[in-house]
Amino acid sequence: MSQVNMRDMLKAGCHFGHQTRYWNPKMGKYIFGARNKIHIINLEKTLPMFNEALTFVERLASGKNKILFVGTKRSAGKIVAEEAARCGSPYVDHRWLGGMLTNFKTIRQSIKRLRELEVQAEDGTFAKLTKKEALMRTRDLEKLDRSLGGIKDMGGLPDALFVIDVDHERIAITEANKLGIPVIGVVDTNSSPEGVDYIIPGNDDAIRAIQLYMGSMADAVIRGRNNVAGGTDVFVEEAPAAAAVEG
């Protein structure tokens, strides 16, 4: 099993938190100190927690389970889409639509519409329409693809969420909590770890840090799938209860 090391995290700047005045006291036990009014995250705590999360994801993937990658803010979206595509996982990189998990039946209908429009665009149907109607359908297709393109092949609810910036994606986490779906999340010093089953204390803004988290998670999914291909029998453990997060 390939694991991330301290040097990787330092090079990526995972230890840089937010300004001290914006800190969340619930993250206090993961803070090493402060430098120039910026909180420094204790990577000696982060590293084993990150590797534990990677092990969990690898075990899930080995059981053919689906991990949904979520990162919709500007610094995360492109990386989330690229790494999710690399490992064949569903993702949300543009905007989290309310009810994406808790009202999946309705979302499924929108995905069906997306697929219909994709077929029409390919089979020449658009070319037979009036210019105005073709333009309207093209816009609908682009809008649906931007919102749902990353989950159109998910097939059903995911078995876990991996979230970059838990404050920014709080709606997604709340929906996952309601459905009992385990949440793995990168939690910065200004955020609350509430509702996150696998906490990864770390910088959730720096592109190099996001690349490290996402690349490592994608690698874990690929390793897990390879275990299945190789006939390895791997046990999937349950996520620790979110209630275990200390206030």
Curated annotation (Swiss-Prot):
Which GO-annotated molecular functions does the record name?
structural constituent of ribosome
The UniProt entry's GO CC annotations, sorted and at most eight, read:
cytosolic small ribosomal subunit
| InterPro entries documented for this protein | Ribosomal_uS2, Ribosomal_uS2_bac/mit/plastid, Ribosomal_uS2_CS, Ribosomal_uS2_flav_dom_sf
Gene3D superfamilies, A to Z: Glucose-6-phosphate isomerase like protein, domain 1 (3.40.50.10490), Helix hairpin bin (1.10.287.610)
Under the heading CDD domains, the entry gives: RPS2
Example GO BP: translation
Q: Does the keyword Ribosomal protein apply?
A: yes
Q: Does the keyword Ribosomal protein apply?
A: yes
Keywords for this entry? Ribonucleoprotein, Ribosomal protein
Which domain of life, per UniProt? Bacteria
One Pfam family, short name please? Ribosomal_S2
Family, similarity comment: Belongs to the universal ribosomal protein uS2 family.
PANTHER family xref list:
30S RIBOSOMAL PROTEIN S2 PROKARYOTIC AND ORGANELLAR, SMALL RIBOSOMAL SUBUNIT PROTEIN US2M
Q: Which HAMAP family match?
A: Ribosomal_uS2_B (MF_00291_B)
- Its recorded name reads Small ribosomal subunit protein uS2
Taxonomy of the source species: Bacteria, Pseudomonadati, Pseudomonadota, Gammaproteobacteria, Pseudomonadales
